């Protein structure tokens, strides 16, 4: 049966259909005004890691009114498409083959997409495109030996991106992790407990990423059989937790591995006594703490404690877990609608670790502050809104963990019946600080104008402040004063009516006239020699220059005279050298700058003393730099001349306010190159001078002046912040602690005050390592610091939910650790019968600081009785003299190093045997050398036994050869004389008389007359010098006490004299002991060789002493030239050195 037919629908009237159609149109998503929605991102690019030659797609999809154009930026610069890089239809970026560092152009970097439509543009978050990389192993397993039943630990460390997965192999096979006593930590550590013989073998780790795989070196584990009975020992943590910095949602492991008998129990706690999160935390292996899905609340200090069961014996180790978090918004900017000439304020706040950096964008471009637009930490303020300000604004928060953006739109509403802009604006310069501005009334609705506003700002530079002046409608000109001289300004005018403001007028730019400089340059004075002063100065800041400096006038005079000498220098000059001055005199110097208008104010007289004229080499003046840090603090920096070879013991710093007494000296160490002067007065001029000094005298000083600026008031605060603590004082307590003390600010309204101390090493780059400590006292002992490290400290106070600024920074160094080792290379050399020279080298270790050495020496008899003789030397000296030694004894010598913290261990004992004196030699050698003489002889006579033997053999051979030659010459001379006599008797020839003048003595000339055929044999065979060396030797005569240069006075050679006279005079010739005088100040050794009873036969020898002249000895003497103060000996560090004469004897062979 067919279904019944449905009744036909009733026809609706046309009016109802029309209303339904209109409702459908209103609800339909039509384009244009009907479907307007703000521009936003549906998908943004994300961080990605790829391998070379792989394709990659960075997503970017925007939503809003079409058409939407998408462009891409890489590292802030616009990208262009090519064969490899293409922007897809949905806005995403496609790279077909990623190029790495080896290619011509790397694709690594930060990418952002920019979406734009007719309402504005927005910028996406940053996405980092990185290549998969892996480095070489930073830490590899090390072979070890472990007792059976003990614990073994191997470690691997490697840097890679993404992080590598580390596994372990045992004897080249994968190490199973099924046993509880073996634990492999994700950080690359392998732990083995209850080691047995089956664990012996080779271990290595394997690091693998998606694209790389590396194997470490093998390390062997040797198991030593255990003893039958194990002795008790307290727990020891052999691998404690390390400080870790991680990101949110990562997994971290805090290692804690301990040994002991019995096996210790390992427990974990937090230093702040908070409970450990049990849901995301578990113990891995035998005591390692693993935290998964790390959150901000997991940050803190964790303490590992190893305890002996059933006892209170325990040991602890701790580490800090720092959790970094990407930025997140706390407050978002909201879209605004404002009229023309109104003010718009956007507020945006974000948090993160580390604190994010805030910036603002307009249509995807970074905003820079100017007169109308100002940016604070969390605000964007736009004054005097113009139509061009209608745009989309974004707040961007960025830190090391990422970036986020939030957007808002500013809509500018314009009134239809507003007046037109003022026109025909022009400016005229009136003076160095005033400009006249004039304009015409608006062409339309000028009768409705109720006021004008004049806007002006500096034309040069960024972040210039814009100023506004409101005047009535009854005038069309205005004089703007209080302007800066020699500056360009930009002006525009706005007209106001009850319905709103007009458009801006055209901009005009005009400059002010020049003026005289507001203040003089700040000068620096140094000396390079005792007769000059180098005057240098910095250019005057533009704020105070007030024009172009064309001239400097330099004035100087002696402090004891009234006459002033004046020099005029070009405006491009910034230093001048005054020469021809008097040494050790005080000079006064001042300077004046001038522009085209005229001279400005002169500086105050600055004094400088020229150095003394002395032969002692004093340290040169350091290069000094002063910089005001704030209105009460000046940073003093300096640098010593690298070419300065003078020894420096430290620095002296003086400073004074202009017209006040000088403060100082402040003694600074040689390592200090920075000092902060705090607690100064604002807007004051200070004079600072610095010099280097040593144990001899002060060096050349550097003088400089600097002015402190005025204090700037804190803006945008209803309640002013409290003042910071002052008079912060630091003093080193130990090598790992510094005591701080400060004063409370002078206010008593609040009773409860807390302080925060900031502490970090100078030059620290990682901000997460800065230490913050809390206290309610005005003093604190900061512990756990590194030895011999310079730290900076600052303090701020907290009261009534307000925090003060940080106090001026104070720098101080921890004390060094006591020397851990003894001096090395100890050597003892006998240089006289009763004097020995001991030398050494500083203890090993670059961080070892030595301020004093202690030398203990004693004979064996005294050593057995415990009686030591003690000498002390400064840390810069590495040698000393041991005097008054007794012959026939064996001496024991040992040395230790010490500093202000403590004394290090003594070196191994070194023995020195002093041989008994021989009677024949005892009368010919000096009995004793004092300290001053030893200083001279140490450069020449530091010879060992082998060297003395070689010299003696050489001298003996030389004397034998000379004696043979003399005998041969005498024999030949007799033969020739006999032949000449016979020839004279025969009357055949006659000798020219000129030949006789070549011989020494009249007697020889008479005997040689008449020799004709043997003229050449009558020439002297030896020149007046001691000898002739064809190899370029010197006329040096060496005896057992060192080298002596013979005088060049003429002598009579024996073989030129008559043989009869020789026989008569030979018995009368004798050698007397030579006397050597050491004359203080001349350093010359004088030897009188002949007896005072035989005048006319005197032959003197002289030789100036100096280490530099002994080129041969410097290659063979060890320890005598290691310091610049070598030879500066005394029994005590404060003994005076007396220079005395030394009586010496000349051996008979000379």
UniProtKB/Swiss-Prot annotation:
Ig-like domain span: 36-130, 135-222, 235-322, 327-411
Region (Disordered): 981-1002, 1086-1150
TM regions (residue ranges): 950-970
Regions of this protein lying in the Cytoplasmic compartment: 971-1150
Gene Ontology cellular component terms for the protein in this record: extracellular space; plasma membrane
Residue stretches of biased makeup (Basic and acidic residues): 1110-1138
Biased composition (Polar residues): 983-1000, 1092-1102, 1141-1150
Domain Fibronectin type-III: 421-515, 517-613, 618-717, 724-817, 822-917
Disulfide bonds: 60-113, 156-205, 256-304, 348-395
Entry keyword set: Developmental protein, Disulfide bond, Glycoprotein, Immunoglobulin domain, Membrane, Repeat, Signal, Transmembrane, Transmembrane helix
Membrane topology: Single-pass membrane protein
Entry-listed glycosylation sites: 90, 488, 630
Top-level taxon of origin: Eukaryota
PROSITE patterns xrefs: FN3, IG_LIKE
InterPro entries: FN3_dom, FN3_sf, Ig-like_dom, Ig-like_dom_sf, Ig-like_fold, Ig_I-set, Ig_sub, Ig_sub2
A Pfam family it matches: Ig_3
Compartments, as annotated in UniProt: Membrane
Cytoplasm listed as a keyword: no
Family: Belongs to the immunoglobulin superfamily. DCC family.
Function description: May play a role in anteroposterior axis elongation.
Protein name: Protogenin
Origin species: Homo sapiens (Human)
Lineage, uppermost ranks: Eukaryota, Metazoa, Chordata, Craniata, Vertebrata
Gene: PRTG
């Amino acid at each position: 049966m067919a279904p019944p037919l449905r009744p036909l629908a009733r026809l609706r009237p046309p009016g109802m259909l029309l209303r339904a159609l209109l409702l459908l149109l209103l609800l339909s998503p039509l384009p244009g005004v009907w479907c307007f929605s703000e521009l936003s991102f549906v998908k943004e690019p994300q961080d990605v890691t790829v391998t070379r030659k792989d394709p990659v797609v960075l997503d970017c999809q925007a939503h809003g009114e079409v058409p939407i154009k998408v462009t891409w930026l890489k590292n802030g610069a616009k990208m262009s498409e090519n064969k490899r890089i293409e922007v897809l239809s949905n806005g995403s970026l496609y790279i077909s083959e990623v190029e790495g560092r080896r290619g011509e152009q790397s694709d690594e970097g930060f990418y952002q997409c920019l979406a734009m439509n007719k309402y504005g543009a927005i910028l996406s978050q940053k996405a980092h495109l990185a290549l998969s990389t892996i480095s070489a192993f930073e830490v590899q397993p090390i072979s070890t030996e472990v007792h059976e039943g003990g614990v073994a630990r191997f470690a691997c460390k490697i840097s890679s991106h993404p992080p590598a997965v580390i596994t372990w192999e045992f004897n080249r096979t994968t190490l199973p992790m099924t046993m509880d006593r073996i634990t492999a930590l994700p950080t690359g550590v392998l732990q083995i407990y209850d080691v047995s013989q089956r664990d012996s073998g080779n271990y290595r780790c394997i690091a693998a990423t998606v694209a790389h795989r590396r194997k470490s070196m093998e390390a062997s584990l040797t198991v030593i059989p255990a003893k039958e009975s194990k002795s008790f020992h307290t727990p020891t943590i052999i691998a404690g937790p390390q400080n870790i910095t991680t990101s949110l949602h990562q997994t971290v492991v805090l290692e804690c591995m301990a040994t002991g008998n019995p096996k210790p129990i390992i427990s974990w706690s937090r230093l702040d006594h908070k409970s450990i999160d049990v849901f995301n935390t578990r113990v891995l292996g035998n005591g390692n703490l693993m935290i998964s899905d790390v959150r901000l609340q997991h940050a803190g200090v964790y303490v590992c404690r190893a305890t002996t069961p059933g006892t209170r014996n325990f040991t602890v180790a701790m580490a800090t877990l720092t959790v970094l978090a990407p930025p997140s918004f706390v407050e978002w900017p909201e879209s605004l609608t404002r009229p023309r000439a109104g003010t718009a304020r956007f507020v945006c706040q974000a948090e993160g670790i580390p604190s994010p950096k805030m910036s603002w964008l307009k249509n995807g471009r970074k905003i820079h502050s100017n007169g109308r637009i100002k940016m604070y930490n969390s605000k964007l303020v736009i004054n005097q809104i113009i139509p061009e300000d209608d745009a989309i604004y974004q707040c961007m928060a960025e830190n090391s963990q990422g970036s986020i953006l939030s957007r808002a739109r500013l809509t500018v509403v314009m009134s239809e019946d507003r007046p037109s802009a003022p026109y025909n604006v022009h400016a005229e310069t009136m003076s160095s600080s005033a400009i006249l501005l004039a304009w015409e009334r608006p062409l339309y609705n000028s009768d409705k104008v109720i006021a004008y506003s004049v806007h002006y700002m500096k034309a040069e530079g960024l972040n210039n402040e814009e100023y506004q002046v409101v005047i009535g409608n009854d005038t069309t000109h205005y004089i703007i004063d209080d302007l800066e001289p020699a500056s360009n300004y930009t002006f525009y005018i706005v007209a106001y009516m009850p319905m709103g403001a007009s458009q801006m007028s055209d901009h005009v730019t005009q400059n002010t006239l020049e003026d005289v400089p507001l203040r003089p340059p700040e000068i620096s004075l140094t000396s390079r020699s005792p007769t000059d002063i180098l005057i240098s100065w910095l250019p005057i800041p533009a704020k105070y220059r007030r024009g172009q400096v064309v001239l400097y006038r330099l004035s100087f005079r002696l402090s004891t005279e009234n006459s002033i000498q004046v020099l005029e220098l070009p405006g491009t000059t910034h230093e001048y050298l005054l020469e021809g001055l008097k040494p050790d005199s005080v000079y006064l110097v001042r300077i004046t700058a001038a522009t085209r208008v005229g001279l400005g104010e002169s500086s105050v007289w600055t004094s400088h003393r020229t150095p003394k004229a002395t032969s002692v080499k004093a340290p040169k003046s350091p290069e000094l730099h002063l910089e005001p840090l704030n209105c009460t603090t000046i940073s003093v920096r300096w640098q010593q001349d690298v070419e300065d070879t003078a020894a420096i013991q430290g620095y002296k710093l003086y400073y004074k306010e202009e017209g006040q007494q000088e403060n100082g000296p402040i003694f600074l160490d040689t390592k200090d190159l920075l000092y902060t002067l705090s607690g100064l007065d604002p807007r004051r001029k200070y004079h600072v001078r610095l010099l280097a000094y040593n144990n001899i005298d002060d060096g050349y000083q550097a003088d400089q002046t600097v002015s402190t600026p005025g204090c700037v008031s804190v803006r945008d605060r209803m309640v002013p912040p409290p003042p910071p603590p002052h008079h912060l004082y630091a003093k080193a307590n130990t090598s790992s602690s510094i005591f701080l003390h400060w004063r409370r600010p002078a206010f008593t309204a609040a009773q409860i005050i807390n302080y925060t101390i900031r502490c970090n090493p100078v030059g620290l780059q990682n901000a997460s390592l800065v230490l913050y400590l809390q206290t309610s006292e005005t003093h604190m002992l900061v512990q756990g610091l590194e030895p011999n490290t310079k730290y900076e400290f600052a303090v701020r106070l907290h009261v009534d939910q307000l925090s003060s600024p940080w106090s001026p920074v104070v720098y101080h160094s921890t004390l060094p650790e006591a020397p851990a080792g003894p001096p090395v290379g100890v050597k003892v050399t006998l240089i006289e019968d009763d004097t020995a020279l001991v030398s050494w080298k500083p203890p090993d270790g670059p961080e070892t600081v030595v301020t004093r050495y202690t030398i203990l020496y004693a004979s064996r008899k005294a050593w057995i009785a415990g009686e030591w003789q003690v000498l002390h030397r400064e840390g810069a000296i590495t040698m000393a003299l041991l005097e008054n030694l007794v012959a026939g004894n064996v001496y024991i010598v040992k040395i230790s190093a010490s500093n202000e913290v403590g004394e290090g261990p003594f070196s191994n004992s070194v023995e020195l045997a002093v041989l008994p004196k021989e009677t024949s030699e005892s009368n010919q050698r000096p009995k004793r050398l004092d300290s001053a003489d030893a200083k001279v002889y140490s450069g020449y006579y530091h010879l060992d036994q082998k060297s003395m033997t070689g010299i003696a053999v050489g001298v003996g051979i030389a004397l034998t050869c000379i004696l043979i030659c003399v005998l041969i010459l005498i024999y030949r001379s007799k033969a020739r004389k006999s032949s000449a006599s016979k020839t004279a008797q025969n009357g055949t020839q006659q000798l020219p008389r000129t030949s006789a003048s070549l011989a020494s003595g009249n007697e020889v000339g008479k005997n040689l007359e008449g020799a004709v055929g043997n003229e050449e044999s009558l020439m002297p065979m030896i020149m007046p010098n001691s000898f002739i060396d064809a190899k370029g030797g010197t006329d040096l005569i060496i005896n057992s006490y060192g080298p002596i240069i013979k005088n060049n006075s003429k002598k009579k050679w024996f073989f030129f004299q008559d043989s009869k006279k020789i026989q008569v005079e030979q018995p009368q010739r004798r050698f007397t002991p030579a006397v050597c005088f050491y004359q203080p100040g001349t350093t010359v050794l004088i030897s009188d060789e002949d007896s005072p009873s035989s005048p006319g036969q005197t032959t003197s020898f002289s030789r100036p002493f100096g280490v530099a002249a002994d080129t041969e000895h410097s290659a063979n003497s060890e320890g005598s030239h290691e310091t610049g103060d070598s030879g500066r000996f005394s029994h005590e560090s404060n003994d005076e050195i007396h220079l005395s004469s030394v009586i010496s004897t000349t051996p008979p062979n000379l």
